[in-house]
Design a protein with these regions (language model features):
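Non-catalytic terminal extensions that flank enzyme cores
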Residues: 1-47
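His/Glu-based metal-binding/catalytic segments typifying zinc-dependent metallopeptidases
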Residues: 40-42, 49-51, 162, 166-174, ...
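M16 family metallopeptidases and their MPP-like homologs
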Residues: 45-55, 81-129, 136-147, 174-199, ...
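Active-site His/Glu-centered metal-binding helix of metallohydrolases
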Residues: 62, 66-70, 578
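Generic recognition of flexible, low-complexity loop/linker segments
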Residues: 94, 210-214, 273-276, 319, ...
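Non-catalytic, conformational "gating/processing" segments within enzyme and secreted inhibitor domains
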Residues: 158, 210-242, 723-758
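Long, compositionally biased intrinsically disordered regions
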Residues: 432, 445-533, 671, 680, ...
Length: 972
């Protein structure tokens, strides 16, 4: 049987989608009207999603809350949290749900056929038959609810989405983004934040929430996607029988209306919060925003991505450089959102002055006019095109299956034209057209039409305001206090009872008979053998090469690693700056602009970084490397190595103006990252009180690095030559053959072809550089808190089990899954209202527990301290134990691209990890019994007794718990 034999479906189109090596089908389910797009190929990492067009009508976050709550039990699978049960007990390679401005998408992926079918079934039942209509408690838990524990207690609001968005709106970037869309689309859905504004989320009623669900969650409004190597006919027959045939077509009014263009540019101002003692100077965000065409235009879709690179994102790009030269903003960047009906292109200057708004706009327009008049740098255009095409061809999306990214890409057009899901995947022809257009005035005309003459635009200014967060908290507290005062004794009693009832609902586990309704694999379905490493030693001109014999589709992945273990702690901040600056300063043959363009024309990227590796065999030996990575088509290897050699051996650090620009940019980006990734920052900072690995992470990427960058910025203004000299000294010290190790990922033939080129580049390096002993370090304080202007916290507690005499075993991987998806999930997220909570046990002994966008502080630390009690009483039945094991294997066996396989092998080589060791750990996981987990209680107790904590977050919450900390200071 073929798709053509399925009477239930109408084939609207079928053709080969060659650019992604797939057979494409566009179908319509006749009875229900469901839309289906299929990409059939030989990729065993299969992907499914169902999406719905869900245009919000207000700022209550109803699409977002529904996305959270549909996965809280359904008709077939009535367990309270099937999402978590699947995370515990499936071999998924992706499992999540996402709310976009105009759609909500529920994707899953797996390499196991039966697992894939199970995931599809649970997700489809979740969206079509959720328990949200039966249990208002689900809405209260995930959305929002009043919380009152006693008649004399303070009335509060809690809820997972509510707290998530409080965290989001603490970020000026989020405030800017929401204001841009509000300014450009006042008359359609894009002016409303589908995620929800915390000010308006509590205005959402249960009834309005259900109305939204019933209106949009119907097959007639659905977009169903299948990708990969599967029996497509069997899946379609099942889909019809189990779900789609149960529904008749229904007219769903979910179309997104186009926003009419404006007669003139709009000017909008907004505010974001900073702490009371923060300076307001140079903290303003300025933006220049234009609506550019529509998302169904294949050429524009790619062309503005290229213009983003050529005009603003690349080093020395004309708009960026003009603004930086005028002293407007520390960080200037572009933004291009093509995932909505009418794409948006923006120029943004971060950390500017509000008084510079007019000058900002004038400089952009004058620069664009000059670019149109004299022509865009053709090398920059070619670099932008090549970079986009290389990324598309390589299809390396990290931990995300490429089939998922292809599917989400489909929605950029499919949502607005039922016949066009694949147009942006068939883009190699578009890239070819764009290359030809470089020699015409095509790009200049785009600038004139869409960025200069276009009045459908806005200028959005977001200014800092001291204590705005506190003002809002006080206003909310007064509003809640007034509301409570207006209630009768009976109404207050009812609120207390509702709070108790919700907690009881949250604490009550799903009945065993409900849990058994969820489909599950068995231990026998797990792969018995670990993925092997590929590390083959070679030597070229006295330099050790570790090569990884892996098929890499004609791309060479090469890393040059240089020993940096003898760098003093006081040098690490400069090394961090050096790492960020290399490749962004001029060299002997190239200006920094030309260097960036050449890199993107001839390679898939040259990146620099540092890599920290504990030596598993010798705890006192710490492997610390400076790393240069490049990816390149074999035919361009010589050019790529020449560019890398220029970067490493001839970089010019005497241009202190350029160094100042880079310091300001790094500082601005760190400010955003320290808050947005506060959980990781807090965990590393906490572990830096005892761990060399974490200390280096903090010194090179975390809070200590931010402090170093601030000092370097000051030093550049007072003694610029000293900074130049230090950077040049780092290059002289690092880049020598006796410090060098090369990692090569590619097959044997590729390596044989590359050897002469590698020998040539090695010969260009000095033979020797004095290498000292491993540097002494001074660890940070064990109990710290860092205040920012957010309304939530990131709460970390850490320790080290190796130094307490315990050993790493595979059971610790299993414990991580158990804690993440059971104890911590229930106590920190479900009951506590935090958006997330995670834990990790490293082979080297470092361990952490950390929450994400958490409304609590001391309560969360108490939850951590009770973990050993939970472990001691851990007594699952065989089915539950198997579920945890399967969930652990899901992370162990995530599919890897060639570069990731090479990187995994290299890490094992540097850390002294053997195949026998990981196979032993795998066996320990596969054969684990409850008593193996219970035996870990003392280990976790030893970790927690270290009592090393770090909290990043709200000033009032930190001050209330000031007794917990030895050091409290501002984050930035």
């Amino acid at each position: 049987m073929t798709i053509h034999d399925l009477a239930e479906y109408e084939i609207l189109d079928e053709h080969r989608v060659e650019d992604v090596q797939s057979d494409g089908f566009i179908l319509r389910h006749k009875k229900s009207g469901a839309r289906i797009a299929i990409l059939s190929n030989n990729d065993d990492n299969k992907v499914f999603y169902i999406g719905f067009r869900t245009p919000p009508e207000d700022e209550t976050g109803v699409p977002h809350i529904i996305e959270h709550t549909t996965l809280c039990g359904s008709k077939k699978f009535p367990v309270k949290d099937p999402f978590i049960e699947l995370a515990k007990g499936s071999l998924n390679t992706f499992l999540n749900a996402m709310t976009y401005p105009d759609k909500t998408v529920y994707p899953v992926a797996s390499c196991n056929d039966q697992d894939f079918k199970n995931l599809m079934d649970v997700y489809l039942d979740a969206v079509f038959n959720p328990n949200i209509t039966k249990y208002e408690e689900i809405f209260k838990q995930e959305g929002w609810h009043y919380e009152l524990t006693g008649k004399d207690d303070e009335l509060k609001i809690n809820g997972v989405v509510y707290n998530e968005m409080k965290g989001a709106y603490s970020s000026p970037d989020e405030v800017l983004s929401s204001q841009i869309y509000r300014s450009l689309f006042p008359d359609n859905t894009y002016s409303k934040d589908s995620g929800g504004n915390p000010e308006y989320i509590p205005k959402l009623t249960y009834e309005a929430y259900l109305d939204f669900y019933h209106k949009y969650y119907h097959p007639s409004n659905s977009y169903i996607y299948l990708y990969g190597d599967m029996d497509v006919v069997e899946r379609l027959v099942w889909l019809d029988k189990e779900y789609l045939s149960l529904y008749d077509y229904k007219k769903v009014n979910s179309e997104i209306n186009k926003q009419s263009a404006f007669d003139k540019i709009k000017n909008v101002e907004a505010q974001y919060s900073i702490t009371m003692d923060d300076s307001q100077e140079n903290k303003t965000y300025l933006s220049y925003n234009r609506v550019v065409g529509d998302s169904l235009d294949e050429m524009l879709y790619q062309a503005f991505d290229v213009l983003d690179y050529a005009l603003v994102s690349s080093p020395g790009a004309p708009v960026k450089q003009a603004l930086i030269d005028a002293g407007i903003g520390d960080d200037v960047y572009g933004s291009y959102d093509a995932g909505i009906l009418q794409p948006v292109f923006s120029f943004v200057a971060k950390n500017a002055n509000a008084s510079q708004a007019d000058e900002f706009e004038s400089i952009i327009e004058n620069t664009l006019k000059e670019v149109v008049k004299t022509g865009i740098n053709k090398e920059a255009l070619l670099a932008g095109i090549n970079s986009s095409e290389f990324k598309f061809r390589e299809a390396d999306f990290g931990q995300f299956p490429k089939g998922l990214l292809f599917g989400l890409n489909c929605l950029d057009s499919w949502l607005f034209d039922d016949m066009k899901p694949f147009i942006h995947l068939e883009c190699l022809g578009t890239f070819a057209k764009l290359r030809k257009a470089v020699d015409t005035d095509y790009f200049e005309k785009l600038i004139q039409e869409y960025l200069l003459d276009n009045t459908h635009g806005s200028s959005v200014t977001v200014k800092p305001k001291r204590g705005l967060g506190n003002e809002r908290e006080e206003a909310l507290a007064k509003e809640l206090s007034d509301y409570k005062a207006s209630l009768s004794d009976e109404e207050i009693k009812k609120l207390i009872e509702d709070t108790e009832h919700l907690k009881k609902y949250q604490e009550e586990p799903s009945p065993d008979e409900d849990l058994r309704k969820l489909p599950m694999l068995t231990r026998a379905d797990m792969k018995k053998n670990a993925m092997p490493f590929s590390n083959i030693e070679d030597e070229l001109l006295d330099v050790k090469v570790v090569r990884h014999d892996i098929e890499s589709n004609g791309i060479d992945y090469i890393s040059f690693l240089f020993d940096a273990g003898d760098f003093a702690q006081s040098e690490l901040g400069y090394l961090g700056f050096f790492t960020n600056a290399l490749g962004l300063v001029s060299t002997e043959k190239y200006s920094y602009t030309d260097l960036a363009n050449a890199t993107n024309i001839y390679t898939g990227g040259i990146s620099t970084g540092t890599a920290s590796h504990p030596d598993i065999k010798d705890r006192n030996n710490f492997v610390f490397k400076f790393e240069v990575k490049l990816k390149v088509l074999e035919k361009n290897l010589d050019k790529a190595l020449e560019l890398m050699e220029q970067m490493l051996l001839t970089s010019d650090f005497t241009d202190t103006k350029r160094l100042g620009e880079l310091v300001a940019q790094i500082k601005a980006r760190l400010q955003a990252n320290l808050s947005s990734s506060g959980h990781l920052v807090a965990a590393m900072r906490s572990m830096s009180s005892f761990s060399r690995y974490a200390l280096y992470q903090d010194e090179l990427k975390g809070i200590a690095f931010y402090r170093s960058i601030c000092r370097i910025e000051k030093e550049l203004s007072e003694s610029p030559k000293s900074v130049s000299d230090k950077l040049a000294a780092i290059a002289r010290k690092l880049f020598a053959r006796n410090r060098m190790l090369i990692s090569f990922t590619g097959n044997n033939e590729a390596y044989a072809n590359a050897k002469p080129s590698l020998e040539k580049v090695i010969a260009g390096f000095n033979k020797m550089s004095a290498v000292g002993d491993q540097a002494e370090v001074h660890f940070n304080t064990a109990k710290e808190a860092f205040i920012d202007a957010s309304q939530i916290q990131y709460v970390a507690k850490t320790g080290d089990f190796i130094c307490e005499g315990y050993e790493y075993t595979g059971a610790l991987r299993l414990l991580r899954v158990i804690l993440s998806y059971d104890y911590l999930w229930i106590n920190v997220r479900v009951k506590g209202g935090a958006y997330g909570c995670m834990n990790t046990f490293l082979r080297s002994g470092e361990s952490y527990f950390v929450s994400y966008r958490d409304p609590n502080l001391s309560d969360t630390l108490d939850v951590y301290d009770r973990i050993p009690e939970y472990i001691k009483s851990f007594s699952p039945d065989e089915r539950d134990m198997t579920k945890y094991i399967i969930g652990t294997f899901s992370a162990l066996d995530t599919p890897m691209n060639p570069e990731a396989k090479g990187s995994r092998s290299l890490s094992a080589y540097l850390e002294g990890i053997t195949y026998e060791q990981i196979q032993k750990e795998r066996n320990e996981i596969l054969n684990a019994q409850p008593e193996d987990i219970r035996r870990l209680a003392d280990l976790v107790e030893a970790v927690l007794k270290k009592d090393s904590i770090c909290v990043i977050g709200n000033e009032n919450m930190i001050k209330e718990s000031a007794g917990l900390f030895e050091n409290v200071e501002k984050l930035i």
